[in-house]
Curated annotation (Swiss-Prot):
It catalyses: NH4(+)(in) = NH4(+)(out); methylamine(out) = methylamine(in); CO2(out) = CO2(in). Ammonium transporter involved in the maintenance of acid-base homeostasis. Transports ammonium and its related derivative methylammonium across the basolateral plasma membrane of epithelial cells likely contributing to renal transepithelial ammonia transport and ammonia metabolism. May transport either NH4(+) or NH3 ammonia species predominantly mediating an electrogenic NH4(+) transport. May act as a CO2 channel providing for renal acid secretion. The chain crosses the membrane at residues 11-31, 59-79, 84-104, 122-142, 149-169, 177-197, 217-237, 248-270, 275-295, 297-317, 341-361, 391-411. It comes from Rattus norvegicus. Glycans are attached at N46. Its main location: membrane. Residues 1-10, 80-83, 143-148, 198-216, 271-274, 318-340, 412-455 are cytoplasmic. The keyword Transmembrane applies. SUPFAM superfamilies: Ammonium transporter (SSF111352). GO terms for molecular function: ammonium channel activity; ankyrin binding; carbon dioxide transmembrane transporter activity. The lineage of its organism: Eukaryota, Metazoa, Chordata, Craniata, Vertebrata. This is Ammonium transporter Rh type B. Residues 32-58, 105-121, 170-176, 238-247, 296, 362-390 are extracellular. InterPro entries: Ammonium/urea_transptr, NH4_transpt_AmtB-like_dom, RhesusRHD.
């Protein structure tokens, strides 16, 4: 077993301590409770406790939080020798991202009086940023070390926050469930990152890039958690009342349709009529991605079913046919197939948002037009103009993701980082003490580290 040299093994603890120290200092200087969290401010206004936003937002936050740490973490444990890293590095990267995103989004959205003011909505938005980072992590799963992932999160959270601010605040784009800002951005950031980190000798570890019965079973736990809580994910930032209610309903039915289409297509493309667990674990979730943008709009229940069915179909076909083409022709080594689960369904969701926005009328929304499309309600935009802004937002996201992912790949190629050698990718023992294997390891001579072939 090749080991990471001692000087490179110090990078992770140094980065953890440096990042925690820096964020702690910034929190001390800038971060304060908002008026619904601060004891003096809340009670000075003589508010009733039942009116506090905590009681409306915390249930959704709790579900989103579970999705980030349990759903994403366990979805990636399908690799037979990489379970510790899948869950553990998800834990590490997400916790750092939550702190960093709170600062970044705070400066952009809630900075006044010289301070960032935070509450439960800040927690939800930070979780969304962590979700995008973990999507990118899926593209390079098994081929990067924890220090590399921390640097990836450092850069990606900045670009995510700026892209989100441009779309939502400057362009007036509607993207409640993040088809563009979370899924499309995270997927294509990760794909371009993977392209820059391409390994020509990855075949040396290909025997580890497979699953076994138990690893697939644990990954299915992640799928079920994500599937069950996805309506909360899409509805968490939406306006209270009918908007949040409608978002849950649309997401719910879209997920059911994507699941049925995934089972159907998986059996059809297998050749012998048997199901592929990779398809079920991933493509069944595409319905939640595809309605992210349009979930708060008047999509209609039939529209949600149709969108989910299309997303499940496209995602399943992507896993079967498109992923091998991406690697062989475009040198994109997408470990988790994020292009199929998040990338293509995210683009479909953005286009769906364009179409539904173009059909927005006061007759369809009534006074609810003010909460879903405030610029149309105020007469500052037509429905067609809003649709064009939605489309432009998709292209802005792709630019940020592609340029950012490429820059991130160059950053992660720095020689002092903890990249695993080609022959030890998808292997927990490079970074973790694995029970039952330490004694056997000490009885074998350790090989010197092999150079990797990231080019």
């Amino acid at each position: 077993m090749a080991r990471i040299p001692r000087h490179r093994r110090l990078v992770l603890p140094l980065l953890c301590l440096l990042f925690q120290g820096a964020t702690s200092l910034l929190f001390a200087i800038f971060v304060r409770y908002n008026h619904e969290t601060d004891a003096a401010l809340w009670h000075w206004g003589n508010h009733s406790n039942v009116d506090n936003e905590f009681y409306f937002r915390y249930p959704s936050f709790q579900d989103v939080h579970v999705m980030v740490f349990v759903g994403f973490g366990f979805l990636m444990v399908f690799l037979q020798r990489y379970g510790f890293s899948s869950v553990g590095f998800t834990f590490l990267v997400a916790t750092f991202t939550l702190q960093w995103a709170t600062l970044l989004q705070g400066f952009l959205h809630s900075f006044h009086g010289g301070h960032i003011h935070i509450g439960v909505e800040s927690l939800i938005n930070a979780d969304f940023c962590a979700g995008a980072v973990l999507i990118s992590f899926g593209a390079v799963l098994g081929k990067t070390g924890p220090a590399q992932l921390l640097l990836m999160a450092l850069l990606e959270a900045v670009l995510f926050s700026v892209n989100e601010f441009i779309l939502l605040s400057l362009l007036g784009v509607r993207d409640a469930g993040g088809s563009m800002t979370i899924h499309t951005f995270g997927a294509y950031f990760g794909l371009f990152l993977s392209r820059v980190l391409y390994r020509s000798q990855l075949e040396k570890s290909r025997h580890r890039q497979t699953s076994v019965y138990n690893s697939d079973l644990f990954a299915m736990i992640g799928t079920i958690f994500l599937w069950v809580f996805w309506p909360s994910f899409n509805s968490a930032p939406t306006a209270l009342g009918d908007g949040q209610h409608r978002t849950v309903v649309n997401t719910y039915y879209s997920l059911t349709a994507s699941t049925l289409s995934t089972f159907a297509l998986s059996a059809l493309v297998s050749g012998d009529g048997r199901l592929d667990m990779v398809h079920i674990q991933n493509a069944a979730l595409a319905g939640g991605v595809v309605v992210g943008t349009a979930s708060e709009m008047m999509l209609t229940p039939f529209g949600a079913l149709a969108a989910g069915f299309l997303a499940g179909t496209v995602s399943t076909l992507g896993y079967k046919f498109f992923t091998p083409i991406l690697e062989s022709r475009f040198k994109l080594q997408d470990t988790c197939g994020v292009h199929n689960l998040h990338g293509m369904p995210g683009l479909l969701g953005a286009i769906l948002g364009v179409l539904v926005a173009a059909l927005a009328t006061h007759e369809a929304y009534g006074d609810g037009l003010q909460t879903v499309f405030p610029l149309i309600a105020k007469g500052q935009r037509s429905a067609t103009s809003q649709a064009m802004y939605q489309l432009f937002g998709m292209f802005v996201t792709l630019v940020f993701a592609s340029v950012g992912g490429s820059l991130g790949g160059l950053l992660l190629k720095l020689p002092f980082l903890d990249s695993p050698p080609d022959s030890q990718c998808f292997e927990d023992q490079v970074y973790w003490e694995v029970p039952g294997e330490q004694e056997a390891e000490t009885q074998r001579p350790l090989r010197t580290e092999e150079p990797d072939t990231q080019a």
